[in-house]
Amino acid sequence: MSRIGKMPIKVPPGVTVDIKGNDVTVKGPKGTLNRTFRPEVTITRDGDYLVVAPVGTDKAARSFFGLSRTLLDNMIVGVKDGFDKNLEIVGVGMRADKDGNNIIFKVGYSHTVTVAPPAGITLSVDGTTKVKVSGINKEEVSQMAAEIRSIRKPDHYMGKGIRYAGEYVRIKPGKAIGKGAK
């Protein structure tokens, strides 16, 4: 049994949860999220708590048990507080500029790269080297941050590129000039 899945989820004040079979709708101050869960799990309400339980003891039910509990918890946290992912741009001349809802990246290519956020995602620029991705759906926020990072991944020789805030990039040593070099 999943240790994470066994823990009940507390529903905070200001958040309403509507359960209809495997369809769950969570409404809060930041917005509304809806998800259809797998038939291998059941979700029930017990006072101010939500309880996720597997249907049966087969491998599929056990594997979706903890996942479903975490997804439901992320929905509740998202509509209450929201999620943020911060990115940093490292490198001489590399920058990001805001243009309406879009962000224009100048990251060492011969052209600029324009990123338009999908619905429900907000992009903001702090200074010219910090980008913040925010929204209520953790999966969409993380996916958007990963797409932005993939524009110019950090270089392992110089460390230049777009990285997550606090991400450690291991710098490789360059070519060593040895004894036989002429």
UniProtKB/Swiss-Prot annotation:
GO molecular function annotation: rRNA binding; structural constituent of ribosome
Keyword field: Ribonucleoprotein, Ribosomal protein, RNA-binding, rRNA-binding
InterPro entries referenced in this protein's UniProt entry, alphabetically: Ribosomal_uL6-like (IPR000702), Ribosomal_uL6-like_a/b-dom_sf (IPR036789), Ribosomal_uL6_a/b-dom (IPR020040), Ribosomal_uL6_bac-type (IPR019906)
Gene3D superfamilies, sorted: Ribosomal protein L6, alpha-beta domain
Listed GO biological process terms: cytoplasmic translation
Pfam families (alphabetical): Ribosomal_L6
Domain of life: Bacteria
GO CC terms: cytosolic large ribosomal subunit
Transferase listed as a keyword: no
Protein family membership: Belongs to the universal ribosomal protein uL6 family.
Job description of the protein: This protein binds to the 23S rRNA, and is important in its secondary structure. It is located near the subunit interface in the base of the L7/L12 stalk, and near the tRNA binding site of the peptidyltransferase center.
Subunit structure: Part of the 50S ribosomal subunit.
Name this polypeptide is given: Large ribosomal subunit protein uL6
Gene behind this protein: rplF
